[in-house]
């Protein structure tokens, strides 16, 4: 079993009889000698969908669950439900808008390549996105000539409604690459 300091975002833990998906991890390093680093983890309970927050010391042993991953393509929206189709056997997987609210901020209208669903014991748990996505800037302050030398940023609204900080020289209509987990600008898209 792994230690708390080996846990990554997207892993699933069996903790206090609950299946919890790791949504976010904050690492708090103490300044006092001999004090242990604390890992504050935010989870989503698989069965109830409730948000759960727990703290662990770096050397605490945690029980992880092995999941099965299936490649999927976005198929269609049916009211409040989003349907994804298995790439191999065409099994439909349905999520409510609330279940994948975060992921929808990064998903272009027609879906994106390399998406996976996580299942455990036949139960649908989560939708996993690739590390990066290319999106178009739909609204931002106009680009400033000669701004490439400065490292200042400005907010930009992307085609999915997500707002991130981008360099000043970018303008509306440009496609950019975003690191999904860190919600940050990586560069212009190819």
Curated annotation (Swiss-Prot):
SMART domains: EFP, Elong-fact-P_C
An individual GO BP term: peptide biosynthetic process
Leader sequence residues: none
GO molecular function: translation elongation factor activity
Family matches, as PROSITE patterns: EFP (PS01275)
Domain of life: Bacteria
A Pfam cross-reference name: EFP_N
Protein name: Elongation factor P-like protein
Organism: Salmonella typhimurium (strain LT2 / SGSC1412 / ATCC 700720)
């Amino acid at each position: 079993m792994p230690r708390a300091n080996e846990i990554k975002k997207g892993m699933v833990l069996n903790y206090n009889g609950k299946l919890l998906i790791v949504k976010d991890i904050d690492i708090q390093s103490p300044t006092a000698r001999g004090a242990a680093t604390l890992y504050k983890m935010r989870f989503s309970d698989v069965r109830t969908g409730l948000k759960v927050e727990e703290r662990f010391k770096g050397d605490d042993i945690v029980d992880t669950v092995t999941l099965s991953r299936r490649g999927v393509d976005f198929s269609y929206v049916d009211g409040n439900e989003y349907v994804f189709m298995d790439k191999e056997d065409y099994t439909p997987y349905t999520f409510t808008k609330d279940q994948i609210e975060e992921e929808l901020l990064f998903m272009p209208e027609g879906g994106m390549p390399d998406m996976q669903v996580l299942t455990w014991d036949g139960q649908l748990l989560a939708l996993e996105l690739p590390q990066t996505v290319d999106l178009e800037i739909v609204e931002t302050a106009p680009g400033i000539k000669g701004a490439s030398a400065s490292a200042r940023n400005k907010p930009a609204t992307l085609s999915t409604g997500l707002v991130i900080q981008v360099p000043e020289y970018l303008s509306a209509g440009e496609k950019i690459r975003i690191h999904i987990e860190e919600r940050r600008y990586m560069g212009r898209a190819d």
